[in-house]
From Swiss-Prot:
Gene name of the encoded protein: engB
One record GO biological process: division septum assembly
Alphabetical keyword list: Cell cycle, Cell division, GTP-binding, Magnesium, Metal-binding, Nucleotide-binding, Septation
A GO-annotated cellular component: cytosol
Name this protein carries in UniProt: Probable GTP-binding protein EngB
Length: 195
């Protein structure tokens, strides 16, 4: 997909702040520091629309980005970061759950995992949550450039097994450095929004 327009619309914490207009939405979820912002920026060919941070757990709101006036990307707060208070974590959990379970415009969730490591307990919980609520999911295994090509299949197998992935769900190898998987990711997203 050729992106000619991409900008942040709103950072929301409650449903009344979500944008109107009925555009399809793709949520992006992943552990803090998994490379979510880099994934968004490389998909839309922008250096810093989604702010990348060396401080994990920085996104504490649902950030809605409009893409080509056709769809919204919704950047969800990173999960699994220890330096955040329990009450903050619970508040984020409620905010994410409310959005994911009630938003009619939500077409799918892109769950981003780090190819270098087996998915964490939080990754597994997130995947199970999405499956439980019947939210279509695309799993992106990022940071592929950090692993020798010959080991990709082995690492992808670990991701599939740890998440106990539904064979119907797409698993895409991705690198924001080399742009590997960018076309496949857009292809999967387009399929979801046209359903």
């Amino acid at each position: 997909m050729k992106v000619t327009k991409s900008e942040i619309v709103i950072s929301a914490v409650k449903p009344e702040q979500y944008p109107d207009g009925g555009l399809p939405e793709i949520a992006l979820a992943g552990r803090s520091n998994v490379g979510k912002s880099s994934f968004i920026n490389s998909l839309i060919n922008r250096k810093n629309l989604a702010r990348t941070s060396s401080k994990p757990g920085k996104t504490q709101t649902l950030n809605f980005y409009i893409i080509n006036d056709e769809l919204h990307f919704v950047d969800v707060p990173g999960y699994g970061f220890a330096k955040v208070s329990k009450s903050e974590r619970e508040a984020w959990g409620r905010m994410i759950e409310t959005y994911m379970t009630t938003r009619e415009e939500l077409k799918a969730c892109v769950q981003i995992v780090d190819l270098r490591h087996a998915p964490s307990a939080e990754d597994v919980n997130m995947y199970e949550f999405l499956k439980y609520y019947g939210i279509p999911v695309i799993v992106i295994a990022t940071k592929a450039d950090k692993i020798p090509k010959g080991k990709w299949d082995k690492h992808l197998k670990v991701v599939k097994q740890t998440l106990d992935m539904d064979p119907e769900d797409e698993l895409i190898l991705f690198s924001s450095e080399t742009k590997k998987g960018k076309d496949e990711a857009w292809g999967a997203i387009k399929k979801m929004i046209s359903r």
